[in-house]
Amino acid sequence: MYNTKKMIPQLHSWYEKQKRPLPWRKTTDPYKIWLSEVMLQQTQVKTVIPYYNRWLNELPTLKAVADTTLEKTLKLWEGLGYYARCRNFYKACQIVEKEFSGHIPESKKLFLKLPGVGEYTAAAVLSIAFGKQYPVLDGNVYRVMARLLAFNGNRREGNRVFLNTLEEWIVEKTDPGDFNQALMDYGSLICT
């Protein structure tokens, strides 16, 4: 197993120099971060960027989404695929506007109740937008963890082991959002 006392500062240093200049990294607005996470599901970053920018030009706030029509959101999504993501995001924005006065819940339990929000999306949004100490585990992070822990077992066991380890590590990090994004970038750019 890798020495985490060395690894975490090294990862942070690498990320500060190598992080990708993505538009959703220039904001702490939970709506914009959430939108990016939904769009990035099963879709490459380079494909998402123009859709993300176009969407925000038309619907810059969660309230704007809640107040528009489903048809308009689907038109903006057209070509991105996996349209259930858009329908769920639209429904979820309406719920947030109505039940939470337009404020995305900072409680993981409440956020997970929204349509289309799963463990990964909740952890990503809450750690990046609100600094909550929730680890993310996507394919990129899985590859990093498998190498660091020299793990070659089955995926289900790997998920359990990696999440437990990440939960320990993220407590050591002052910015859990940066920690999660650093692991994702490292997995995407280095551990391919």
Residue spans of the language-model regions?
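Catalytic cores of DNA base-excision repair glycosylases
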Residues: 2-192
